[in-house]
A protein has these predicted regions:
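Conserved polymerase palm-domain catalytic core
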Residues: 12-169
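Active-site substrate-recognition loop segments, prototypically the cytochrome P450 B′-helix/B-C loop
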Residues: 2-7, 11, 20
Length: 169
């Protein structure tokens, strides 16, 4: 299932997503951060999505997958299989199986769209040129850097208020 899903999703994943992806590494994420801050000094929001893998909403993930019914049923079965702790089985109503081969891909699918969502919201921020004129929405979007490695991400911008507004999102 992973071998079938991964190429499809790799073709659409956001450009600044680095964790658990073929041909991408933590070094690539660090290079992206370095490139962003080398252009201009920037404020940084360093964030971690708390218990991300444990809290993935099964229903939303399955809706987002939009794949063959057979794959959906299999993935749903994996997600709902439960977790063994000793001899006791605990049901799972959310999250991905820890250590599961497909879990990192499912987490990336669940988080896909975060970068575009934040950049889309940034279009409405009050960002101005030094002369007081409002920046175009395209420049506003490009000025916000979001770099994600699995459930860790940074948001970089030269204006601290923009970073704070992104944090609220």
């Amino acid at each position: 299932v992973k071998s079938a899903l991964e190429p499809e999703w790799e073709a659409v994943f956001e450009p600044n997503s680095y964790g658990f992806r073929p041909g991408r590494s933590a070094h690539d994420a660090i290079q992206a951060i370095f490139t962003a801050i080398s252009q201009k000094p920037k404020f940084v929001l360093d964030a971690d999505i708390s218990k991300c893998f444990d809290r993935i909403n099964h229903k939303r993930l399955l809706e987002k997958l939009d794949t063959f019914p057979t794959f959906r049923r299999q993935i749903r079965a994996w997600l709902n299989a439960g977790v063994m702790d000793g001899k006791e089985l605990f049901p799972t109503s959310e999250g991905t199986p820890q250590g599961g081969v497909i879990s990192p891909l499912l987490a990336n699918i669940a988080l896909h769209g975060m970068e575009n969502e934040i950049k889309s919201i940034a279009k409405g921020f009050n960002m101005k040129k030094p002369n007081g004129h409002q920046l175009s929405w395209q420049i506003k979007q490009r000025s916000v850097n979001i770099i994600r490695y699995a459930d860790d991400f940074v948001i970089l911008h030269e204006d601290i208020t923009v970073v704070h507004r992104c944090k609220e999102v």
